[in-house]
Amino acid sequence: MMMVLQPEGLGTGEGPFAGGRGGGEYMEQEEDWDRDLLLDPAWEKQQRKTFTAWCNSHLRKAGTQIENIEEDFRNGLKLMLLLEVISGERLPRPDKGKMRFHKIANVNKALDFIASKGVKLVSIGAEEIVDGNLKMTLGMIWTIILRFAIQDISVEETSAKEGLLLWCQRKTAPYRNVNVQNFHTSWKDGLALCALIHRHRPDLIDYAKLRKDDPIGNLNTAFEVAEKYLDIPKMLDAEDIVNTPKPDEKAIMTYVSCFYHAFAGAEQAETAANRICKVLAVNQENEKLMEEYEKLASELLEWIRRTVPWLENRVGEPSMSAMQRKLEDFRDYRRLHKPPRVQEKCQLEINFNTLQTKLRLSHRPAFMPSEGKLVSDIANAWRGLEQAEKGYEDWLLSEIRRLQRLQHLAEKFQQKASLHEAWTRGKEDMLSQRDYETASLQEVRALLRRHEAFESDLAAHQDRVEHIAALAQELNELDYHEAASVNSRCQAICDQWDNLGTLTQKRRDALERMEKLLETIDQLQLEFARRAAPFNNWLDGAVEDLQDVWLVHSVEETQSLVTAHDQFKATLPEADRERGAILGIQGEIQKICQTYGLRPSSTNPYITLTPQDINTKWDTVRKLVPSRDQMLQEELTRQQVNERLRRQFAAQANAIGPWIQGKVEEVGRLAAGMAGSLEEQMAGLRQQEQNIINYKSNIDRLEGDHQLLQESLVFDNKHTVYSMEHIRVGWEQLLTSIARTINEVENQVLTRDAKGLSQEQLNEFRASFNHFDRKRNGMMEPDDFRACLISMGYDLGEVEFARIMTMVDPNAAGVVTFQAFIDFMTRETAETDTAEQVVASFKILAGDKNYITAEELRRELPAEQAEYCIRRMAPYKGAGAPAGALDYVAFSSALYGESDL
């Protein structure tokens, strides 16, 4: 006959002796009877000895004992006797026969009795016990030990094993060289057992004389003292424990549980102290969180207050280098100074939400930050900071472009002004000469023609002067910092130009008057002058154009310059022919002079330009053409590099931007419509958070490309709609969103565990909340909240609904969050500590007196929390109290906001 028994409501393990779910959780996890463990002879030996000693400690009360655990229980008689002793109940009369079926019947009666106590023994049958199966016999005894010796051990709502471990940790915490973390290796040196005995019976052991390097001596001391003075039989061998790498956990638990029961009478005061410590710890932790919030909020607001004026300062710098230093300072701010503050702001919101949740769960009044430090105040200040930051960056880039333009215009102005001043040098003196008065007719006509050529040259320079004036005007409009010197130079050029015009007109009038007196003019020299002057102007213009500086921002603009230069080069053959024709005129003059024996004039009376001048300028043009070719190709290469940078940045930004947007929407959907258990939701969110963190390298690479663009002074990108600022803002929004959503789920876990909610209840609450969350923003407006309550069966009048709103919306924000909704739905059924419970706990510590002394507090509570109570408790004002008596009733009421501390 095979019996499958298990304690009802015990454990969730999956071993052959594992239990189900419920209050007796001592069977879960490593409490499962692992069959493979018995393959270790050392563990089998320890369990056999320990379990035998444990059984004998109870059987001796009935005047019997066992010697061989797998043999002495085979007939079921001593097994039934053991159950009667430890339970205090009578079992059915055993069968007296010695046949196998009699033994099986007796064992089954014992197993039936175990089953009647809510214990399920999976895979253990009476036949295996009767057959002397050591593994099954040890498993059955271990289950009996769990049910009758360990199951009822509970410390602060923990499972049996966890409660026993926590009890051991608390009792041994003050002792040196003792660190109880488990029921195997933590007990090998014997100090933990000695500490347990010394904690409750300091008169039995001199703990100060114990040495950690003498484990066998320590263990034997504990065993002997326990057996002699505490009536706890020796269940273990010191040598087995020391020489085994990992002593058997169940043997240790069985032996340690005997100490727990031996010292159970001293636990009432400790339980009361634990309750007070728990309440005080909650209060102290909340106060610490409040102080941290105030400190973080003050520091963040102070940083914003200092930073905003700097970002709002729009005073420009006169030089490009100074503005670039400002831009570098701004980059350092975005890269080094702001990210930690973003993290602080996010952490501040998380701390605030966590604090409010803890206050609600512990029935403390809601935390109201000091004036100006609300989360909304910080959010408003942060928005102001970001607005100032965006305006500051736009202003910086605009100023840099303006200074670039100014620098280019100033260089162009100086170049053209220098060329013009070089051209006009001596022209006023030349126009003021009166040489025509003593000249011959031919010389006068030559002077006239020369003057005509000058006027042609002067007219050709009119555009240059107008261009110089236009450049000066543009520099003034762009607020050039050296505008005064530019204006002064431009005014001097314009005044000189007007004077040149006046002098030119006066000289023409004089020469035309003299022309009537003169008849001969050398036509060839005139022809030379007429053709050489415009060609010379063309040469000057060509030199000026070839030396001209440019400012381009794209490949297309550079290609346009290259095309214009190619077109100019195409005109060079025609210009060379014109040069040959002009030089041919001079050759003709020399030929005529040679033919007729004339003495050629050393100068052309119509023009000062010589053929050598034309050849020199022509050579200059020929040399400048390849130089400009090289410069244009270098600029084209630079612009092509910039274009590749633009495309590289755009390719990443066009991938990152939609990814961030998709993640933001995905997080929003997760927050609004979460399914599964809170742990599953948290795991999903943590996975999302890790995915987002892992994606940070893409943002860093994009920042690097953006840095290269800025260093190359590239400020536009037609290949993408995403700027670095868009990516940064989206990234910060994504980090904040995932952190806030994780915090909401953590708070729901706190609420669920504190209120005892099931996952089905949470899912039902979430479904109702989502249905009435019209805007899908995680909050219900008052009308939607009222409709939700009505749909759930609440009959609400105006006064009652107003009362409920003050509970779920204490700050009068006009919305109801999901956390507040859950708090309301579970408020009346929650099992929490109260002021009355704390008063009752203090009364136990005070020995039933209405007051308590500082000495009693220091004796029963940890030092830190005892001093905390002494500082905050008011003196007891009742009659018959000694000096220094403290009022613990008023103090307990103040902890829950029912009075002032």
From Swiss-Prot:
Residues 760-795, 796-831 form the EF-hand domain. One of its GO terms (molecular function) is actin filament binding. SUPFAM superfamilies: Calponin-homology domain, CH-domain (SSF47576), EF-hand (SSF47473), Spectrin repeat (SSF46966). GO terms for cellular component: brush border; cell junction; cell projection; cortical actin cytoskeleton; focal adhesion; plasma membrane; Z disc. Residues 1-261 are annotated as: Actin-binding. Coiled coil: none annotated. Ca(2+) 2 binds at D809, N811. This is Alpha-actinin-3. It comes from Bos taurus.
